[in-house]
């Protein structure tokens, strides 16, 4: 059996390994899986909205209803509101308490089940909650030492995620601004008309129809789309006689156009 020191080293190694993949829908799955393995429990990481950032379920304690929460990547609002009101680690919550993550329909199946919740902080802000549970066997003091270390590691990782998201938002905003600024008045008018034809962020348009509708030439539309595509703001694909398929890659385009008067 691994010693406390060995387990501690495994957790601190997570910081060095950079196990997050921000392109994944659950960017902290790998990290959560490693933490659950070291602490020997089921575990999940949620942000302050209750959205799942990662989870690992080596032990089957869920029913279909609770499985759906993990499938939807979102825990119930009532549970999340209670969880974010915890400011220090709450250990070994009995299975019949509101903060226990076990399905209430299955309490009889896990009479010795316990849940431990630990707040995650980073840069002085509450970033989420680390939730762990076992069907049998309380979390010991050694386990809780690992939990405290784990939340520190997660806090650093989440802080990095927020920083990267901020940098990405700034980059997208800058690219959208630069792309719109390259457009002439007629081209901006054309792009606005095209956006109105889309179903949300994508759809297909017929340039000649839009050109006739707003009184411009088809070449103006073609030039506008070429500029936006070269800036990485949209992508397009010819559909032949059906027109052109468009997808907005940078949704900042909507705000930039909305701020212009035509």
UniProtKB/Swiss-Prot annotation:
Highest taxon of source: Bacteria
Stretches for region GAF domain: 1-159
Molecular-function annotations in GO: DNA binding; DNA-binding transcription factor activity; GTP binding
A Pfam family it matches: CodY
GO biological process terms, semicolon-separated: negative regulation of DNA-templated transcription
GO cellular component assignments: cytoplasm
SUPFAM superfamilies: Winged helix' DNA-binding domain (SSF46785)
Sorted UniProt keywords: Cytoplasm, DNA-binding, Repressor, Transcription, Transcription regulation
Gene3D superfamilies: 3.30.450.40, Winged helix-like DNA-binding domain superfamily/Winged helix DNA-binding domain (1.10.10.10)
Location in the cell: Cytoplasm
Function: DNA-binding global transcriptional regulator which is involved in the adaptive response to starvation and acts by directly or indirectly controlling the expression of numerous genes in response to nutrient availability. During rapid exponential growth, CodY is highly active and represses genes whose products allow adaptation to nutrient depletion.
Protein name: Global transcriptional regulator CodY
């Amino acid at each position: 059996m691994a010693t406390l020191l060995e387990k501690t080293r495994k957790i601190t190694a997570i910081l060095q390994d950079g196990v997050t993949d921000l392109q994944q829908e659950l960017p902290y799955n790998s990290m959560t899986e490693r933490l659950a393995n070291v602490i020997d429990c089921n575990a999940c990481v949620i942000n302050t909205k209750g959205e799942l950032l990662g989870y690992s379920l080596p032990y089957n304690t869920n029913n279909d209803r609770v499985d759906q929460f993990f499938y939807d990547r979102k825990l119930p609002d009532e549970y999340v509101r209670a969880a974010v009101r915890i400011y220090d680690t709450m250990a070994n919550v009995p299975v019949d308490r509101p903060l226990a993550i076990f399905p209430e329909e299955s309490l009889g199946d896990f009479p010795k089940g316990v849940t431990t919740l630990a707040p995650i902080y980073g840069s002085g802000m509450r970033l989420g909650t680390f939730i762990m549970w076992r069907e049998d066997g309380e979390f010991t003091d050694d386990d809780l030492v690992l939990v405290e270390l784990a939340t520190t590691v997660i806090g650093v990782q989440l802080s990095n995620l927020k920083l990267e998201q901020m940098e990405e938002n700034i980059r997208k905003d800058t690219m959208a601004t630069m792309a719109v600024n390259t457009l002439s008045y007629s081209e901006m008018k054309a792009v606005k008309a095209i956006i109105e034809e889309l179903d949300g962020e994508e759809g297909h348009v017929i340039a000649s129809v839009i050109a006739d509708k707003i009184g411009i030439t088809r070449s103006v539309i073609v030039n506008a789309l070429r500029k936006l595509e070269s800036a990485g703001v949209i992508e397009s694909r010819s559909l032949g006689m059906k027109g052109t398929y468009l997808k907005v890659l940078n949704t900042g385009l909507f705000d930039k156009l909305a701020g212009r008067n035509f």
